[in-house]
Amino acid sequence: MRIWSLHPCLLDRRALVACWRETLLAQKVLRGLTRGYTNHPQLIRFRAHPQPLEAVAAYLSGLADEADARGYSFNRALIGAGEDSAGKSCADKVENPYASVARIPVPLGQLEYELAFLRHKVAGRDPEWEQRLSERLAARGELAARTHPLFEVVPGAIEPWEKTKDF
């Protein structure tokens, strides 16, 4: 499971679609509707949020916005849809999910690691996107401006829950 802190516009097609599916799974996990992935480290920051389900809905909305911009069709009805394990409705009633959800802090070191990881993955599977990624990074300016709208950059190293890889 990879829930990127980077802005969705930086993700290639595979990363964007995988992130959408995996965040939908995270939404189910946070509702108590699955047995698996309940202790997955990628969920730590959402569990620490005062409104975890709303935060996941806001995150998914950001992915869907990027999908719309690319002409993809992500089913927004899945965002906040359904009920939790207690039967409570989880419907997302907020038109602008970012207006009422506190931002999640993400250390600059985490963003730097994720960007290096994404570049490594994209280099092997889509060299054309790698070129576009470099152009998008140059256009967006400093790394702090390259986060998903739900996140707020703070000073710091890679998150302790991150399982780092050498590449």
Where are each of the predicted segments found?
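Sequence termini and other peripheral, non-core segments
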Residues: 1-16, 22-25, 29-33, 47-167
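Short conserved micro-motifs on helix faces and helix-strand junctions that flank
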Residues: 35-37
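Conserved, mostly hydrophobic/aromatic
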Residues: 40
